[in-house]
Amino acid sequence: MENGYKTYRDKVIEYLEAHEKWRSSTINLIASENVTSPSVNRAVSSGFMHKYAEGWPRQRYYQGCKYVDEVELIGVDLFCKLFGSDFADLRPISGTNANQAVFFGLTQPGDKAIVLHTSHGGHISHMPFGAAGMRGLEVHTWPFDNEEFNIDVDKAAQLIRELEPRIVVFGGSLFPFPHPVKELAPVAKEVGAYVMYDAAHVLGLIAGKQFQNPLREGVDIMTASTHKTFPGPQGGIILYKNFGDDVAKLQWAIFPGVLSNHHLHHMAGKVITAAEMLEFGERYAAQIVKNAKALAEALAEEGFKVIGEDKDYTESHQVIVDVSDLHEAAGGWAAPLLEEAGIILNKNLLPWDPLEKVNTPSGLRIGVQEMTRVGMLEDNMKDIAVFMRRVLIDKEDPKKVEKEVAEYRKEYQKVYYSFDHGLPMKE
């Protein structure tokens, strides 16, 4: 063959370039994604990607880690400052990996856990079919108040006292409002339970002081991914405060328990992102919440059924829309149609949906964190709502709208709230 296997290399590069061109022409509203700054991209593409470093800085099992160690130690300091934690472990390579470490380090098979149900926004790693189940935990779910779109405090307190679980888990993937940590953490402590908070979706909002800080509300351990409202590379983190002697069990579960090398190029990217958030995080997080509220209000004005009207729709980056009145396939119809128009988001189960509706759920989950980072403000949210109305309610040809969306995105290509581009002009 004349070109041998080089044609495969060329095809991969072609797809990479096509993806980057396409993605930069869309309005990306996936609530679990974001875009990294040029500085973070530099770290992620650095020679750290070739290096191994098992164990702790300056106590490695590999030689040649002197620069890696310095970066990781800077990261520990920055994350502790950012979140007010006693320690930050940057080694988990994803949010699920961080959750695995907690479950394997602090519980035993047969222990009871209370988590958020999938339909109520619980993450798959908390489920019997996820990391919690793989650990052999007996998984129970929080009582949920559909009207409040939150955990039912009174019933939850009763459940904790009845079950006496080993661990309770707050946080989730559908997360428009803070969870009642202050109210329920003391009850969990009464029965000797660990209190864990999965901050994957809201880590950047916590860093920017726009959401509850779980470590100040009674949480023992906070886990997170580092690439949603916290706009870093894909990875994970564990933070804890006043945790006591069980730290050693948790750290042993991380290494050698659920990982060896911890993807040092991504670790370096996390550290730069922490510095960005210390510098710009409060303004970034505040604009995210402003944009989310503005988008929710605009969608309601355009005729959509937006969840949480009586609670000002949202206190996070997420906007939840019920589209079951627009089509029998609901979110399973709406999300692919919007993708044809260059508007990217995901279908989502709502609290009243049975699990059997996972492919045709009632809801759409929308996140504004990425479009906020490329400089969009409240007025842009009104334009996005109009694009969505034209596709889903007016039934316009999505390909026609896609061309307008691509033209619209041309003005929003820089990554702001970063040392590379500073703040958007209005800021």
Curated annotation (Swiss-Prot):
PROSITE patterns (UniProt xref): SHMT (PS00096)
Site (Plays an important role in substrate specificity): H227
Cofactor: pyridoxal 5'-phosphate
Primary localization class, coarse: cytoplasm
EC number(s) reported in the record: 2.1.2.-
Residues noted as binding (6S)-5,6,7,8-tetrahydrofolate in the record, renumbered to the chain: G122, H123, I124
Database matches in CDD domains: SHMT
Pfam name, any one: SHMT
Family: Belongs to the SHMT family.
Protein name: Serine hydroxymethyltransferase
Species assigned in the record: Thermococcus onnurineus (strain NA1)
Name of the encoding gene: glyA
